[in-house]
Amino acid sequence: MKYAIRNTMLAAALAGSMGAASADSIPGMRGHDHTGVTVPDMQQAVEFFTEVVGCKKAMSFGPFADDKGTFMQDLLGVDPKAVIEEITLVRCGHGSNIELFKYTAPDQKDLTPRNSDIGGFHIAFYVDDIAAAKAYLDGKGVKTRMGPLPVTEGPAAGQTILYFQAPWGLQLEAISYPNGMAYEKDAETVLWSPKNPEK
């Protein structure tokens, strides 16, 4: 009980000393730094992102584990006996980084969520010429879906999209909007874009 009261008082004192936080932003938030993805085969993943997509490997480190305690669970919300065998970060042009994880865990599930599943996601790359991107991916034997599909109506009009997949099923997208999108005419907030990284 004393421990809980002491921690509550400490938290209140710290909050008071830091001043009022902005109600609409994490204090000091600058932008999206990276997206983390767990992969089944690190070598395959690094080769795909560097040799097919065109990203550059920045660094690798690991392993991380805790044989005796709950560090992995406490820090990452995974099984206490989970092991991160390796972490590799890649940089992909003018955009945030991708952090690749190779995990083992007693309760690990081997499934890739679809875009319609809760927790499903995809990573999109801006390209200057989406038809050329499609031809390139086809030439590399990458599985692509329908498209390139131009969006001609609504706020996203002006973009063209093409979904494709990594060899292990990760959903990816190529997107292009060389003349911008319709919403930009009247928008108070314009989305950040790798084609104009300074904006």
Feature-to-residue mapping (PLM):
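N-terminal signal peptide c-region/cleavage motif recognized by signal peptidases
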Residues: S17-A20
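Core segments of cupin and vicinal oxygen chelate
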Residues: P27, T38-H94, A132, G139, ...
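Short beta-strand/turn micro-motifs at beta-sheet edges
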Residues: A23-S25, K109-T112
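Bacterial N-terminal signal peptides that target proteins for export
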Residues: M1-M9
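Short, flexible, mixed-charge acidic loops at enzyme active sites
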Residues: Y103-P106, T189
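A short acidic/small-residue loop/turn micro-motif
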Residues: A65, A105, P178-G180
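Vicinal oxygen chelate
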Residues: S22-G28, H32-P40, M59-S60, E86-K102, L111-L137, T160-Q165, ...
